[in-house]
Amino acid sequence: YQCDWSSDVCSSDLIQIPDTLYREEMAKQGVTLPPLGEYGVGMIFLPKEHASRLACEQELERTVRLEGQVVLGWRDVPVDVKLPMSPTVQMTEPFIRQIFIGRGRDIMTTDALERKLYVIRKTASHAIQDLHLKHGKEYFVASMSARTIVYKGLLLANQVGAYYQDLQDPRTVSALALVHQRFSTNTFPAWELAHPYRMIAHNGEINRSEEHTS
């Protein structure tokens, strides 16, 4: 038996939205982003299978519009496809895109936009699973926020910056970085299970409140 150690580690970075990078990259598509704090970015793990991916994207866009917000556009997240990975990691590697969401007329503050993005994320995720797509389970939102963005995966800590080319770009500037690496001991690792999640990082030992009061 040979241990595939490279598929037992999940790593990630949570940083502030790199506004300059995103603004300049979206401008190449003819998209002018609103001021920082008036748009949100979703980091979306999508199925590689085209039909399922398209259905996921369309359902997410539908939810954004139903919630009164604006779909500004999509961006393919540049990754190093030549980065050495084990077959297990490559087999589960998602297609990664970002959706840019502008605030609607009913949203007056960044806090209100954050709450609306939460509703969009949860509503769309449930709606997509209700479609019973062949690869619908591969849809996952790593983050959706007007303040922060999460770059994560089934990667070693020293691979995150190499895999996600945005993290090598000098336009990526952040006053904070929440970095995490976890060796999986009691759960099977996966791209979507890498920490940090959208607000925190932990080692999987958050137990029920009853365990702390009994």
Where are these regions (language model features)?
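Short, well-ordered loop/turn elements at secondary-structure boundaries
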Residues: 6, 171-174, 193-196, 200-203
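Flexible, glycine/threonine-enriched loop-and-boundary segments that flank and lead into catalytic domains
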Residues: 183-193
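Active-site-proximal flexible loops/turns
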Residues: 187, 209-210
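Extended, highly charged
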Residues: 14-175, 179-181, 185, 214
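Extended, hydrophobic alpha-helical segments in both membrane/secreted and soluble proteins
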Residues: 178, 200-209
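N-terminal-proximal low-complexity accessory segments that begin disordered
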Residues: 1-2
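Short, small-residue-biased leader/transition segments that mark boundaries at the very start
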Residues: 6-11, 212
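Short beta-strand scaffold segments in enzyme catalytic cores
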Residues: 12-16, 198-199
